[in-house]
């Protein structure tokens, strides 16, 4: 018969409502906004086609393979309540479409060409179900939550951090001094800002040396293990690894990477290096809002969070719910669980479209950072629980008496909240009272309470269901 050339409707091949999904399929939930006049089945099928085996016309070489084995399938379409022009398209991809252990390849397929597709006005990837068979091809986080606690010898409470500000312009020696003061005051970690790489005012090697000195001095004086997230992000993978090697030679516990601007390939390489060499890896999500902030186009952060757990990182920034950056409580807790837990049930009220089984892949500590201060400590302890890192940048360095007292204030506030919670107090209701009580015997905390008593960042969250 020969083959039938010409353009045919996607839905004839790629819309398969009777398809039973396999345990090995990668499942995706897309929020689709088609152009006027394009029916949902056709738009959903187009998404499945363009992100798997399809192209705009029938090709002779289709006959040389088995499309039934390799094609993505749009297997379910559901309306979005309150949105006439939108719907959720569920697509199943056969596992063989993806290279093992490559987040890069997974994203190139699933969120590649299809996002520029003309028949769609907008497209957003809301969630991905990563099957155990694919999860098992990834190393994942270099160490994970439990191993990190064992390395640091810190249990039963959230960890405390602080981003060193001003983020750009300090010399290496002054930077190291600020690190020392924060760690000495009682923080567990300090952090390079994500923009700090190796600039003319402070080259990376100088910063690494002075920060290592600060860590060792603070450790000796406090008897606690301390760390500073040394940002190894660089212009090339080779340079990034060179910085991680130098950090390891200094004997420090943790390095840092900007995983979206640095890219998944670089991030996965660094995660492998970190596991091989006993370094913890802190991940910053600079650029995430470019991808995840629009409600109807791009990718939800829960997908970027899953991808990070596969690629590898021990900490990742994940919003505060209470500070200056975007984040709805239930939705934030949804992807926080996806980062930390081994098995997460489907729960649409928290934005989780699929049940996810991580089959013992190590967990990632969520980092709450951005516009938070001592008055937030009860809410943060309540929302995030013990397995988290709370980062007070301005909330430490903005203290009227200096960095070390700022650190003391945060540590006292945190310890007071943890103690109150352990004794059965209700942090949500009694939070302010707990902080006030503690400030009676901690002048540092009292001063911090005074500075930030009125600060609130009150806007409606955009990331709603």
Swiss-Prot record:
Changes after translation: The disulfide bond which can form in the large chain dimeric partners within the hexadecamer appears to be associated with oxidative stress and protein turnover.
Stored SUPFAM superfamilies: RuBisCo, C-terminal domain, RuBisCO, large subunit, small (N-terminal) domain
Keyword Disulfide bond: yes
InterPro entries assigned: RuBisCO, RuBisCo_large_chain_AS, RuBisCO_lsu_C, RuBisCO_lsu_C_sf, RuBisCO_lsu_fd_N, RuBisCO_lsu_N_sf, RuBisCO_lsuI
Binding residue positions for Mg(2+): 191, 193-194
The entry's keywords: Calvin cycle, Carbon dioxide fixation, Chloroplast, Disulfide bond, Lyase, Magnesium, Metal-binding, Methylation, Monooxygenase, Oxidoreductase, Photorespiration, Photosynthesis, Plastid
N6-carboxylysine modification, residue list: 191
Note on cofactor: Binds 1 Mg(2+) ion per subunit.
PROSITE patterns: RUBISCO_LARGE
Site (Transition state stabilizer): 324
UniProt record similarity statement: Belongs to the RuBisCO large chain family. Type I subfamily.
Name of the protein this chain belongs to: Ribulose bisphosphate carboxylase large chain
Gene: rbcL
């Amino acid at each position: 018969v020969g083959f039938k050339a010409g353009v045919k409707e996607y839905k004839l091949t790629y819309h398969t409502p009777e398809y039973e999904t396999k345990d090995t399929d990668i499942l995706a939930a897309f929020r689709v906004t088609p152009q006027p006049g394009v029916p949902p089945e056709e738009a959903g099928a187009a998404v499945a086609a363009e992100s798997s085996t399809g192209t705009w016309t029938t090709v002779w070489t289709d006959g040389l393979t088995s499309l039934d084995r390799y094609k993505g399938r749009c297997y379910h379409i559901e309306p979005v309540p309150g949105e006439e022009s939108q719907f959720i398209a569920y697509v199943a991809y056969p596992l063989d479409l993806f290279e093992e252990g490559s987040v890069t390849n997974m994203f190139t397929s699933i969120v590649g060409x299809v996002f520029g597709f003309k028949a769609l006005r907008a497209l957003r990837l809301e969630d991905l179900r990563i099957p155990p068979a694919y999860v098992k091809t990834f190393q994942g986080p270099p160490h994970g939550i439990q191993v990190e606690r064992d390395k640091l010898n810190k249990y039963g409470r959230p960890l405390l951090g602080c981003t060193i500000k001003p983020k750009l312009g300090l010399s290496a020696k002054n930077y190291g001094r600020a690190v020392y003061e924060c760690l000495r005051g009682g923080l567990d970690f300090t952090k390079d800002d994500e923009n700090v790489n190796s600039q003319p005012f402070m080259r990376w090697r100088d910063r690494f040396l002075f920060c290592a000195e600060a860590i060792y001095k603070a450790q000796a004086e406090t008897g606690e293990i301390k760390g500073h997230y040394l940002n190894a992000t660089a212009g090339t993978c080779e340079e990034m690894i060179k910085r991680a090697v130098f950090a390891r030679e200094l004997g420090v516990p943790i390095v840092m990477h900007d995983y979206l601007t640095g890219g998944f390939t670089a991030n996965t390489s660094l995660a492998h290096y970190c596991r091989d060499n006993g370094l913890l890896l802190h991940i910053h999500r600079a650029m995430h809002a470019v991808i995840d902030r629009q409600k109807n186009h791009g990718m939800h952060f829960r997908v970027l969070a899953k991808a990070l757990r596969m690629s590898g990182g021990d900490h990742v920034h994940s919003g505060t719910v209470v500070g200056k950056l975007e984040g709805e409580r239930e939705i934030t807790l949804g992807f926080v669980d996806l980062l930390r837990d081994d098995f997460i049930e489907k729960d649409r009220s928290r934005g989780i479209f699929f049940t996810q089984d991580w089959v013992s892949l190590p967990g990632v500590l969520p980092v709450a950072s951005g516009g938070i201060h001592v008055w937030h400590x009860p809410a943060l302890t309540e929302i995030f629980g013990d397995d988290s890192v709370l980062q007070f940048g301005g909330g430490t360095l903005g203290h009227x008496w200096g960095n070390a007292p700022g650190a003391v204030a945060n540590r006292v506030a945190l310890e007071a909240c943890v103690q109150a919670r352990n004794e059965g107090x209700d942090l949500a209701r009694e939070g302010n009272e707990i902080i006030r009580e503690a400030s009676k015997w901690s002048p540092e905390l009292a001063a911090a309470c005074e500075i930030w008593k009125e600060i609130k960042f009150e806007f409606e969250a955009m990331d709603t269901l």
